[in-house]
Amino acid sequence: MNFSLTDIIMVIVVYSITFLIVGTLRFVGSRRRLSPMMIRDAIHIACGGTILLLPLFSDWFYPFLLPLGMAILILFGPSARRDEDIESPVVHGIDYSQAHSLGPLYYMISTAILIPLAWSKMTVVMAAVMIMAWGDGAASLVAPRIKRRHNYPFGGKSIEGSLLVFLLGFAGAIVAWTVGSLAGVSNVPTVRIVSVSFLGALAGCVAEAASIGPLRPFDNFTVPFSSALLMYLASS
């Protein structure tokens, strides 16, 4: 790996964008008196889009610094000690177990693992993170507010939530594969983008629905890893 000033600048830019998103949503949420969980879910969805900047980096190490740094901040930053900081809605949940309230940390860890692991197929990483961000994030934000949900007989998950994971994840994956194709980092023909995205979203949907019991707090691992594996195989 060679030192790259351009990549360092990109790291700073993406950090700045992330904190701007978090700060803006925190400000709007407080003005509108939204719950911390609603703000957290909105951040989950909005920040996922930064993964689409992955093709702008020349080596996996530089984008790897982004989730690594955010994970360290979540663990040891000011929000780990008090609730009034900008990151607090991301870390501290309501009616969540301690493991589930650390969902954003798992979000960062799974992204940090995927970046070096699938760097040769970085569009897989982009699509998997988008499925996690848009699909799982939308389900968490919208599904609990649907009055007439059709719950599965296990785990407290709903059909409506699964549909949201699939539909928004499918849209996010298509966006990621399209960006990858335009950036010249995807080997998937345009005509196959829909089918590969479909399989990735389906894998994420099934993984999210199956994340019950002890696995329920860890859907930020099960969803992106399942999606990434199937899309990696489907795009080979």
Predicted regions and their residues:
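Selective transmembrane alpha-helices of multi-pass membrane proteins
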Residues: 69-72
